[in-house]
Amino acid sequence: KKLMYDQFPKISYADAMLKYGSDKPDLRNPLVINDITEVFSREDVSFEIFKKLIKSGSKVRCISTKNTKDKPRSFFDNIDKWAKEQGASGLAYFTFEDDGELSAKGPIGKFFSKEALVEIMEKTNSEVGDSIFMACGKLNELEKITALARDKIAQDLDLIDDNIFAFCWIVDYPMFERDETTNKIGFSHNPFSMPQGDLTDKELEDPLNILAYQYDIVCNGI
């Protein structure tokens, strides 16, 4: 097997959770997660299910898949069905098309204006012929389903090269996190580490914003 990188890239914990939904990303997988919550504030987007969820604190994240316009409907429906089997409400999807004018083909395509589609293309680095899979939910559950979906879609599209080792460093872990069940704040990973920055200011800071001198090495998602 060969190394994907001569120098292992450094990825902050925050970036890893946004782009890969996990602090153990498999970088052999080229798919990236993007946050497109902002698009749903547009008046020319009428997908009301997501709009209502966003008002109650949910986010929208999506995965763009390259040149999947010729995939059969069953490819998309099977991924949506799979997401529901994981406990999610499913994955909404559409494909960018241009028959003289930009449009979106798929069950939810009609809810987006041409201008809104252009904004999504820009945010996701997508082109005509690419497809978008999107999910909406509270951050923790959203990260989980998009991370799983990223792996699932890559497997279905045969995007993973098994002959590569893709190492990376994950850095800048949060010192603390909030427990979803108790709503209390506790140590997120390793309590026996130093917080970053000037310690004299830490009492005044929101503990959830404090980063720790913690790091981890990841290879192929492990």
Predicted regions and their residues:
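Class II aminoacyl-tRNA synthetase catalytic cores and aaRS-like
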Residues: 1-222
